[in-house]
Amino acid sequence: MQEAGIDEFAAGGGHVEPAAEVDPAAALKAELRSKPGDWYVIHSYAGYENKVKANLETRVQNLDVGDCIFQVEVPTEEVTEIKNGQRRLVNRKVLPGYILVRMDLTDDSWAAVRNTPGVTGFVGATSRPSALALDDVVKFLLPSGSAKKDAKGAVSTAAAAEAGGLERSIIEVDYEVGESVTVMDGPFATLPATISEVNAEQQKLKVLVSIFGRETPVELTFSQVSKI
């Protein structure tokens, strides 16, 4: 009977149904839910996020609090940047000035984080910080994976255009410094923002978005915002 089953499978061309596509956000959320601890946001100085991450990871080892501080992340996304006419892929921080920490909140873990050089405090109540919702954690951590595909596509399109295979489109700059816009894409979608800088060559804007009650500069493309 087993041989007959194999013959029938071969006769049918050995067709196997393709696996269903997995939603990256749902998969990441399930993975995060299975891990211990809650996610908290700590504030630092913009530009020092990676240094603070390294400082905290060193303190976790030195203070032997690895049983309550499990993971430290500086969320990044891969984007295409145009500089001097050349396109290149760069890692950009999703939350400038902020670091995510997965931990069990205890007196020891709180003190280890709060007294780390470069940390200016937890986001939330001073005595008892609030954990970040899992959906928000997914929103901040997921762009690093999804942005890579977009960035690669942008590079391919640029190469094709330079080879004459595509006609470069001209995008009219219709944004001004001080103008209010709505973020349409990415982790800050639906939030209002104020334009602080316009880069016509790279087709990007620097906007101020209120993140955790504080105005934070975020870099976005023209297509990621909409006029109010």
UniProtKB/Swiss-Prot annotation:
One cellular component term (GO) for this entry is: cytosol
The source's superkingdom equals Bacteria
- Enumerate the UniProt keywords alphabetically: Transcription, Transcription antitermination, Transcription regulation, Transcription termination
- Signal sequence residues: none
For this chain's UniProt record, which GO biological process terms are given?
Answer: DNA-templated transcription termination; regulation of DNA-templated transcription elongation; transcription antitermination; transcription elongation-coupled chromatin remodeling
**Protein transport keyword on record:** no
Cross-referenced SUPFAM superfamilies, in alphabetical order?
Answer: N-utilization substance G protein NusG, N-terminal domain, Translation proteins SH3-like domain
User: Is Cytoplasm included in the keywords of this UniProt record?
Assistant: no
Q: Which InterPro entries match?
A: NGN, NGN-like_dom, NGN_dom_sf, NusG-like, Rib_uL2_dom2, Transcrpt_antiterm_NusG, Transcrpt_antiterm_NusG_bac_CS, Translation_prot_SH3-like_sf
Q: What does this protein do?
A: Participates in transcription elongation, termination and antitermination.
HAMAP family given for it?
NusG
Q: Which family does it belong to?
A: Belongs to the NusG family.
Name under which the protein is recorded:
Transcription termination/antitermination protein NusG
Q: Which organism is it from?
A: Mycobacterium leprae (strain TN)
Source organism phylogeny:
Bacteria, Bacillati, Actinomycetota, Actinomycetes, Mycobacteriales
